[in-house]
A protein has these predicted regions:
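Short, surface-exposed beta-strand-loop junctions and turns on beta-sheet-rich folds
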Residues: 13, 143, 178-179, 215, ...
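RNase III-family endoribonuclease catalytic core
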Residues: 120-121, 126-189, 194-195
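Active-site-proximal beta-strand/loop segments in catalytic clefts of secreted hydrolases
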Residues: 9-10, 82-86, 165-166, 186-188, ...
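Short, acidic, Ser/Thr-enriched surface-loop or helix-capping motifs
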Residues: 121, 165, 218, 229-230, ...
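A contiguous, well-ordered beta/alpha segment that forms the leading edge of an enzyme domain
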Residues: 1-135, 154-161, 234-304
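Generic hydrophobic alpha-helical membrane-span motif
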Residues: 8, 82, 148-149, 173, ...
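Single conserved position on a long alpha-helix in the C-terminal lobe of the eukaryotic protein kinase
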Residues: 175-229
Length: 304
């Protein structure tokens, strides 16, 4: 996981904040290692599972099993963690400054889908029934690691409040000094030097943004980004960015990716049932939707 992590922590005990931050960073790094498919995170890691789970069930590290257990209880087919073959095809095409061949794209889609793998929660094992399937947890791993780091911080009794920021996946622990909520900025999806506006995070809340500006390349004036529709294998064109405020960093990360793949009308329907989620959406045409439960605290940047 290639991301910059910053932790601001406050303590009423001398030296406690530095110790807590070091411990939280170690937790983040360990969680990131076992959920990263590109680097060998050791026994029970996703790297090992992707290498061996087609031959026999792989016993998972507790951190990886915990994340897969969460995902196993999510019913949304629109977010497919078995999309790695398609992701790899696009990464190869990007390195050669071209588009994937349509027939190659269709072939890679044959090796995706929840039916291609089996997670046994009781045994904490993972197996694949297709030798070409691989899981990619990039849509949720950062949020999961942020929650793990936050749990480590809270074990230090002297920590009064903290803010964790892992590449835009942000979590608040307590209110900031002065008992005020944390105000965090949302990146403008078309201006890397500007922000769209700010939202407030209270104790325990998290924010995550998925956008077409984070990893992309352009061909003939068309932007090809990394958030792929698992039905078509193509970059989703519904939004420029989706920011989600949620009770956990994992929930925020999961739903920001999921909502990026859904039309705004469906997102609104889901928000009716999920009262603990709030969103800021930049549509493909640049218009902005802010959910009703965020209207009073949302502060757009000047000129927005």
């Amino acid at each position: 996981m290639d991301t910059f992590v910053k932790i601001d922590a406050y303590s009423d005990k001398p030296g406690e904040a530095r110790l807590a931050i070091d411990d939280a960073m170690q937790t983040f790094q360990k969680t990131a290692q076992v959920t990263d498919r590109f680097n060998d995170g050791g026994p029970g890691s996703l790297y090992e599972a992707n290498s061996k789970a087609a031959a026999a069930p792989v016993t998972l590290a507790p951190q990886l099993a915990g994340l897969l257990n969460y995902l196993d209880h999510q019913p949304d087919a629109q977010l497919d963690i078995a999309i790695a073959p398609v992701v790899d095809l696009w990464q190869l095409a990007r390195s050669q400054n071209r588009l994937p061949a349509p027939e190659k794209l269709q072939e890679s889609l044959r090796h995706t889908g929840k039916d291609k793998y089996h997670f046994d929660a009781a045994a904490q094992t993972l197996s694949y029934n297709d030798p070409d399937v691989k899981l990619d947890l990039g849509s949720v791993a950062k949020g999961y690691a942020v929650d793990a780091a936050a749990a480590t911080l809270k074990k230090h009794s002297g920590i009064t409040c903290a803010l964790i920021n892992a590449g835009g996946n942000i979590k608040a622990i307590g209110n900031k000094p002065g008992n005020m909520p944390w105000r965090v900025a949302i990146q403008h999806p078309r201006d890397p030097e500007a922000f769209l506006g700010t939202v407030m995070l209270h104790d325990g809340q998290s924010a995550a943004t998925s956008g077409d500006y984070q990893r992309y390349y352009e061909l003939n004036g068309i932007r090809y980004h990394h958030i792929l529709d698992p039905q078509t294998g193509q970059p989703s064109r519904l939004h420029q960015s989706v920011t989600v405020i949620a009770p956990s960093a994992l929930d925020a990360d999961y739903h920001s990716t999921l909502f990026f793949l859904l039309p705004t009308t469906e997102i609104k329907n889901r928000l009716t049932a999920a009262k603990d989620l709030a969103v800021v959406i930049v549509e493909n045409d640049g218009s902005i939707f802010v959910s009703e439960n965020l209207q009073q605290t949302w502060q757009p940047a000047k000129g927005i």
